[in-house]
């Protein structure tokens, strides 16, 4: 039986999340969500259950033109790296969810690494 697009996404998401649980070691999680119009990212401390930092293409002060493209993802990645460092976070685990590590997700991850986050 062939799986549809949504089922493949859910299968990937569960596989990624289970791998992250095994290697987390108490490090915060850099969680990415991409919709058809926007991109958002959070640094989440799963031990305490709190969000330490967040950035989104919906924020006016980031100056994102075209809210869901590679350039916007790079700006959001740089912003989350800066905000995470202010919150005292330098090392995270990258949680791409069910999204492929390609295009916008890759641009966001590369910009966050250049901003000083280690993962």
UniProtKB/Swiss-Prot annotation:
Gene Ontology MF annotations: 5S rRNA binding; structural constituent of ribosome
GO terms under biological process: translation
Tagged with keyword Transferase: no
Transmembrane segments: none
InterPro entries xrefs: Ribosomal_uL18_bac-type (IPR004389), Ribosomal_uL18_bac/euk (IPR005484)
Function, as annotated: This is one of the proteins that bind and probably mediate the attachment of the 5S RNA into the large ribosomal subunit, where it forms part of the central protuberance.
Subunit details: Part of the 50S ribosomal subunit; part of the 5S rRNA/L5/L18/L25 subcomplex. Contacts the 5S and 23S rRNAs.
Protein name per Swiss-Prot or TrEMBL: Large ribosomal subunit protein uL18
């Amino acid at each position: 039986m062939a799986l549809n697009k949504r089922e493949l996404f859910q299968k990937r998401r569960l596989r990624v999340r289970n791998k992250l649980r095994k290697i987390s070691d108490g490090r915060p999680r850099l969680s990415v969500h991409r919709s058809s119009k926007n991109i958002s990212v959070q640094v989440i401390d799963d031990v305490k259950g709190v969000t330490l930092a967040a950035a989104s293409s919906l924020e006016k002060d980031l100056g994102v033109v075209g809210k869901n493209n590679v350039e916007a993802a790079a700006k959001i990645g740089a912003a989350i790296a800066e905000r995470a460092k202010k919150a005292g976070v330098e090392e995270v685990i990258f949680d791409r969810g069910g999204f492929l590590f390609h295009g916008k997700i890759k641009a966001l991850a590369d910009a966050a690494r250049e901003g000083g986050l280690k993962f």
